[in-house]
From Swiss-Prot:
Species this protein is from: Brucella suis biovar 1 (strain 1330)
Gene3D superfamilies: Glycogen Phosphorylase B (3.40.50.2000)
GO CC field: plasma membrane
Name assigned to this protein: UDP-N-acetylglucosamine--N-acetylmuramyl-(pentapeptide) pyrophosphoryl-undecaprenol N-acetylglucosamine transferase
Gene assigned in the entry: murG
Organism lineage string: Bacteria, Pseudomonadati, Pseudomonadota, Alphaproteobacteria, Hyphomicrobiales
The reaction(s) this protein catalyses: di-trans,octa-cis-undecaprenyl diphospho-N-acetyl-alpha-D-muramoyl-L-alanyl-D-glutamyl-meso-2,6-diaminopimeloyl-D-alanyl-D-alanine + UDP-N-acetyl-alpha-D-glucosamine = di-trans,octa-cis-undecaprenyl diphospho-[N-acetyl-alpha-D-glucosaminyl-(1->4)]-N-acetyl-alpha-D-muramoyl-L-alanyl-D-glutamyl-meso-2,6-diaminopimeloyl-D-alanyl-D-alanine + UDP + H(+)
Subcellular location: Cell inner membrane
Length: 379
């Protein structure tokens, strides 16, 4: 890593969940290959996701989430953000970065505000079809905005927005080389259930209940991989054991891209990283947007894939165990439909997003405007 890092330092700032950190990791991999020394500024939640960064290149910045209107809580929040600003300034004085790139989440506010106030070029990447609150607060200050699913040429900041897609990690690109092979009607059917990096309690209850309603000969075909929150792991595993269905249940899978490539069908939330990985690998999916998202970003992400014919989208409120069982049974017995969905999903994937985002980052470092970058990248 260090013998290549002759271009200078770039700091990536990301909230401590997989949805923010996975695209940051993908960009880091691309930038390192180009000779950049890449550091990560994040929060304490990030420890299980930051294996791609050397320990001395991970910097925990004090931060807090702005929520509610309680004056005392708000005062504590703004105090934490101010301390994070001081942390960031101290870090940047030492590292002297040529660029700071934000990937969303409130922990990006202190580093991006500090960088812009210090005259360091800044760039934010918005993974979702609807801009998150932290990025909204930064959009007016940064040099450029990169979008994953943002609508093209619309919004107040269209002039400085470039649609790059969402960078995916190298293991996703490896998994993308595995072609989709539909299961025959009597073959084993590999189902992947994925709630995003933080899991989904709803799936831990609803999927076993739906599987219990399947005819016995259909249950006998199932091989399930399911991500579940730690508090739901044992109950989900026991439910499948009682039904006689082989199931690998865990809070987190380090090899999720390979498991996705191995799946015949995916049931998932529709966070931006999840949808991006589904499209790059090319797998048929049922997407159930998280219903309590503040900006309904997951619904917008899911709609983008559904419009291409790559997924079915179902509201959680409409998904009874009975309906879920019917949809699962239909998927298991319509291999041609799933094959078409897989092709449609892959057709909208952007496997070169990390390259394009790195190109934009280097353009901003060199002093180019977004307009100059766009003109130089026209087909």
């Amino acid at each position: 890593m260090d013998n290549l890092a002759n271009q200078g330092v770039i700091v990536l700032a990301a909230g401590g969940t997989g949805g923010h950190l996975f695209p940051a990791e993908a960009l880091a991999h691309e930038l390192r290959a180009r000779g950049w020394d890449v550091h990560l500024a994040t929060d304490a939640r990030a420890q299980r996701f930051v294996g791609a960064f050397a320990q001395d290149h991970v910097h925990v910045i004090r931060s807090a989430t702005i929520a509610g209107r309680n004056p005392v809580a708000l005062l504590k929040t703004f105090w934490s953000l101010w301390q994070g600003n001081l942390d960031s300034r101290k870090l940047f004085r030492r590292l002297k970065p040529k660029l700071v790139v934000g990937f969303g989440g409130y922990p990006t506010l202190p580093p991006l505000y500090a960088a812009s106030n210090m005259g360091i070029p800044t760039l934010i990447h918005e993974q979702n079809a609807v801009m998150g609150r932290a990025n909204k607060g930064l959009a007016g200050r940064v040099k450029a905005i990169a979008g994953g699913f943002l609508p093209e040429n619309s919004g107040a900041y269209a002039a400085k927005t470039v649609i790059t897609g969402n960078p995916v990690r190298p293991p996703v690109l490896v998994a993308a080389a595995t072609p989709y092979t539909p299961a025959g009607k009597d073959d084993r059917f590999r189902l992947l259930v994925f709630g995003g990096s933080q899991g989904a309690q709803f799936f831990s209850q609803a999927i076993p209940a739906a599987v219990a309603l399947l005819p016995e000969h259909e249950r006998a075909r199932l091989l399930i991989t399911q991500q579940a929150r730690k508090e739901d792991e044992a109950s989900a595993r026991q439910a499948y054991e009682k039904l006689g269905v082989p199931a690998d249940v865990a809070p987190f899978f380090n090899d999720m891209p390979a498991r996705m490539a191995d799946a015949h069908f995916v049931i998932a939330r529709s966070g931006a990283s999840t949808v991006s990985e589904i499209t790059v690998i090319g797998r048929p999916a049922m997407l159930v947007p998280f219903p309590h998202a503040l900006d309904h970003d997951q619904a917008a992400n899911a709609a983008a894939l559904a419009a291409a014919g790559g997924a079915e989208v179902v509201r959680q409120a409409d998904l009874s165990p009975q309906r879920l069982a019917e949809m699962l049974q239909s998927a298991m017995n319509e291999p041609e439909r799933l094959e078409q969905q897989a092709k449609a999903a892959k057709s909208v994937g952007k496997p070169d997003a990390a390259r394009l985002l790195a190109d934009l980052a280097e353009a901003i470092v060199s002093g180019k405007t977004v307009q100059e970058f766009k003109e130089g990248n026209r087909p």
